[in-house]
Amino acid sequence: MENQKKKGTLGTTIGYGLGSMVRTGENLWGFYLSYFLVTVAGVGAAAAGTISGVALLLASVWCIFIGYISDNSKSKHGKRRPIMLFAIFPTAILMSLIFIKVDFGGGTLAYYAIVCILFYLFYYTYLVPYDSLGAELTVDYNARTRIRSLCTVILYVSVFVGGTLVMYVQTGFANAGIGGESGSWSWAVMLSCALPMLVFGLIAWAATKGKEPVGEEIAEQPKGENIVKSYLSVLKVKPFLGIAIWSLLYFIGNTILAGTLVYFGVYVLGLSEATASTYFTISMVVTIVMAIPANWLSGKFGKKTALLIAMCVYLVCGLFVCIKGPSGYADGAIIAIGYGITNSIALIVSYSMVYDIGELNEFKFGDSKVAACIGTYTLGMGLAQAIGYSLIGYILAWAGFDAMSMEQSESVLNAITTTETIVPILFMAASAIAVIFLYRITPKNYAALVEALEAKKEGKEYSTEGFEELL
């Protein structure tokens, strides 16, 4: 416990935060996988959506097992970092293999399906222990938010890399005659995305050496609890059930929003691919700027209220563009700004909210089950992405989207606009209901919980006064 009480050093915090660059792969996937498969690789829109959805669905289920394995690891090197090291190399390699145009005839779909599935399996194998490790750097309510703020800033640097930089690099290679249209994608992804993922993933692994529970701390965990019992016990905790439901619903809307943004810019607003990609730059800058206000909102009003405020921001932006009617670059910029503000605050506070549940679990069960919490949270996120990407593909197919034509019908343009504005708002509104009624951890009752937990561990008298509602 002594290790947990310590606040992570600045170097550890920065090194850990840099590991979020691994999410470059996730952002590249979200922004360009469907676009690459449909317009470059020649895969049908519905098939592309299915490949993405199936890969995310299988990987989401896999993250449950990774969470359980990580929580129960008895490695002398730690519970998180050995798994991170094992997964980072294949994650980077598979990311490169996805964005290669192949022509295996009837086997082309199988190639992309297999590579996409393997990528996300290894990606989550890295990500679940990595995210879990963040909870073990400190138990301080506000310090956790600051850690997640840095992670989110780095995440949005990865948004710039996977959403904007890669497109400029690809365009530069194509204009220089390097690889043609398809080959330029391969080189751009390998150099600007896969390589940084590998380097910064290893930096996070190295910077957190000695910061995870090993030895006696592992021996303190309850014995004989199988994976089913472990996750059922976590889901019985109402605050976590609330944040798990939120993650599922919110990230469906978020995935649809991000995945449709390129289509919205290119086809509805009539922009070039490079110009449309600047929306990701806008959202990245907004996210970085919002890191400090997000911390202030969380500290002033609590993480739950900050999360609800964040979703209201996109509600206003999305409704404005939809009601006014999209007509130019500025409308996409409004969407990008709203997306950046909402997603920045949401990512910062939601992970920190999950971390805070660890102490509640420990008080009730004698084990924080951090990786189980992160695994379940990631499952909700992954299921949401699977559903979201599939919905994008099927909506485009249903509306009659023609990938070979730059001029789309009015019904297709209306479908893209609705998918970019109203659909995300509906999912965010539904997710807010779960948070409002189930997640009741506040700065005040969390402080009382931590105080009682410390007394309980030291064998002293303790009281549940101040956090009874959490039990």
Question: Which stretches of residues belong to each language-model region?
Answer:
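Membrane-embedded alpha-helical bundles of multi-pass transporters/translocases
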Residues: E2-L471
